[in-house]
Amino acid sequence: MGSLEPRVITEEFLDGITALDKVCPHFHLSLQSACNETLKRMNRKYTIEEYMEKCDMIRKAYDRPAIATDVIVGFPGETEEEFATTVANLEKLNLYEMHVFKYSKRSGTIAATMEHQVSDAVKEKRSNILLELTANQKAAYEQQFSGELLPVLMEEYDCIDKDGKPVYVMKGHTDRYILVKQETTREVCEQSINAFVDVLYRPEKSK
């Protein structure tokens, strides 16, 4: 489920969707910053503590749900202390994936006229820190499923050269939106597109 506001996550909401077998345990829950002071300047109507509570509720409702979010670095006024708080809280949240964006000034917005605009160099540095963090957290999350037989919706396949020989590789996603690649024959690839295939998952083979 994508682009959900934290306020949407309630016990009633979770009771309703857990009763549906068509809902995948993948949630994109809006965040933008993991520091309350920054969130306040962004005019967000939630705190990081409330966000953490919503994540806990989802994790109690589903087995190993994949929770993803968006984070903006370099919002006007974001100090080193605020960014450090964001990093610390994101480490605690341990999300499946973060889409990291550098704040970009847009004319006509309140943020564009705010004091203490952050330099491009600082934005780049902070972005790289979060990109490294999310890469590590994503790898750790996916490792939980290593050795498990996972149903994968196969979406496409490629033919690659491997030691001078053509090798066919199917690509698809699990219900948690984990990318899976599987080497097989051309015939199996053609038969499996837009179908579910059980795959013994090995993270190192899906890079």
List each model region and its residues.
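Flexible glycine/acidic-rich beta-alpha junction loops that bind and position SAM and/or redox cofactors
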Residues: 8-12, 31-43, 73-80, 97-121, ...
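Terminal RNA-binding accessory module
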Residues: 113-207
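A structural motif corresponding to the C-terminal end of an alpha-helix
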Residues: 57-66, 93, 129-141
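Ser/Thr-centric signal marking residues that sit
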Residues: 69, 78-79, 86, 109, ...
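Short, electropositive alpha-helical surface patch
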Residues: 11-26, 78-96, 120-125, 154-163
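Conserved SAM/AdoMet-binding glycine-rich loop
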Residues: 1-80, 91
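Hydrophobic, well-ordered secondary-structure elements that form the walls
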Residues: 29, 70, 90, 98, ...
